[in-house]
Amino acid sequence: MTIENHCPCGSQKSYQNCCEALHLNVDSGAQVATSPEQLMRSRYCAFVLKNFDYIIKTHHVDFLGSLTLEQLKQGPNPNWLALEVLAANEETHPDGTLRGNVTFKAWYKLAGEIDAIYERSEFVFQQGRWYYTQGQQMHAKRPGRNDPCVCHSGKKFKQCCLTR
């Protein structure tokens, strides 16, 4: 998958017709994510493209903690393989806030090892925008050699990302 063909977020659209407008308009707000899933996909795409400014600006300030732009730039910087969205929803809470969550696996290769960030991410809608707040990490089972590859190439894992 190349950026010219498909957006890294897995939408099957071109980057220009998908996450690019969100990335370019993060400061102006001219175009913002319309759902927690769209924000999560655009954040994954930003990680792939090393657009760490977008990551910081779409992370709710109350949940940033000590995370900085410089820390993100320093790495680690894995080779991102694919994003798999497992579930997404949004709902209005009793206090009136609109919240959502997205469960996903973001597969990557780092130092020759394949692993995934398997997370249930939480989001909040404030001031006309969705923001990432926090996530609950889970353990991702690595695919077997004969399982379909995590990158959705249609090949077996052993014939694709396992050997890259």
Curated annotation (Swiss-Prot):
Domain of life, source organism: Bacteria
Similarity field? Belongs to the UPF0225 family.
State the name under which the record lists this protein: UPF0225 protein SO_2497
Q: Which lineage is the organism of this entry classified under, starting from the top rank?
A: Bacteria, Pseudomonadati, Pseudomonadota, Gammaproteobacteria, Alteromonadales
